[in-house]
Amino acid sequence: MGIAGVSGIGSEAGASFAWSNAVNMETLVAAANADVAGMRYVANATIRGLLKGRPKIGTTYPVFMIEDNQLNGYPVEVTNQIAAGDMFFGDFTQVMMGEWGVLDILVDPYTGSSAGTVRIVAFQSVDVAVRHPVAFTLATSIT
């Protein structure tokens, strides 16, 4: 479902996710000629927390994988709409939204008439698609 269900996106194993996995995610996208300045990571809040505490290098005075909400210079966005354990990297300008018609707002004075209220209902027909699946890579089951 969503970008994760789109055929053609890159994939990266998430077990023992390390700096090299992040670089590989970026490389998969760049090698497919989808590399643009607007790339970013999008992760579940749990994964962001995990990677904020995971050293990129060093253990005595470590440099962590995510610092200042960036991973290797790319922004890290957070949403809990992504499955726990998953993280995307890609060009999110390649996600397209299509709209058919306009927002249809209807006033229903009958449903709540006995209570003296008016019900307002809104309808809109939209869909979302990925224009270039190679512009994304997904790491799953990050540990």
PLM-predicted stretches and their roles:
Residues 33-38:
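Short gly/pro-enriched beta-turn/loop segments at secondary-structure junctions
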Residues 1-31, 137-143:
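Alpha-helical scaffold segments that mediate packing/assembly in large oligomeric complexes
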Residues 44-58:
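Active-site pocket-lining segment
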Residues 55-143:
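Sequence/fold signature of self-assembling virion shell proteins
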